[in-house]
């Protein structure tokens, strides 16, 4: 019995010592945890900007040798840039877009390089969500349109023996026969529109701006008459002594009216997209003219990682622009239409969402 009592006592003593050591270790661990620095929790900053840059370069070439059906050897090249920078925070947004488009064409039948496409388009829109609405925004919209370089219509020179002349002489005759059609800021269109934006989803928006200031700029005197620029005040009412070289017209025409703009972009899938923009402007100060219409369409079909097929169309109707027929006669308002198809290299840079 004595041995059993001694064994039990020894076990109790050892258990007590073990419990004391465990309590001491737990206390030390708790102190260590309290003294340890707290781990930093990284809070991701809100992202308000989304940027993208799309570039496209197309090259075309045709070579004919002893081709019975005839034709021209041609070389063409065009470049397109579409940059977007959009900001959104809460009920406010600010969207910015810049499109640059330029191309040229050389054909063996003409010893000159011709411009095939030329466009500058800048748009900036600010909007603030209207109270107690879901899709309506108060908005201010600014845009600017023009082109980089002078554009000509190249008519065949009426000179005998043109084909037998040396290249420089041919070039000089072609330049003498060309007709100036446009240039940088000739024309240029810019306006500021205040109104309401209807944005039901990410791919569609409709803007109505009943307060729109519009400026048409033609800095080349010889083109002002074709764009119906207003007569300068010093020549108003004069029957004689009025210049006829275009200097009698002002370089700026101001309009005040209403604008309706519709934008839509539909991505059918990751490789196929369609975008369109329609803009109508009616001038309160000149109601005898029809509303100015601009309608642009673009189809992008991505064939491979860096290659795409593109179709673009541009339609313009402006009855203040006088366009002559093929013979250079009967100038009047006409529907302007341009269509192009291109296959080329495409590269897109976009910010991560």
Model feature map: region roles:
Residues 92-94, 133-136, 203-206, 271-274, ...:
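Repeated loop/turn-to-beta-strand initiation elements of outer-membrane beta-barrel proteins
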Residues 60-80, 108-112:
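Surface-exposed strand-loop-strand hairpins of Gram-negative outer-membrane beta-barrel proteins
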Residues 57-63, 89-91, 100-106, 142-152, ...:
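Transmembrane beta-strands of outer-membrane beta-barrel pores
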Residues 336-353:
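Outer-membrane beta-barrel "beta-signal"
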Residues 17-54, 353:
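Sec-dependent signal peptide cleavage junction
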Residues 115-255:
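Outer-membrane pore/translocation modules
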Residues 73-79, 116-122, 186-190, 252-258, ...:
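Residues that define the transmembrane beta-barrel architecture of outer-membrane proteins
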Residues 53, 57-59, 79-87, 122-128, ...:
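Residues on the lipid-exposed face of transmembrane beta-strands in outer-membrane beta-barrel proteins
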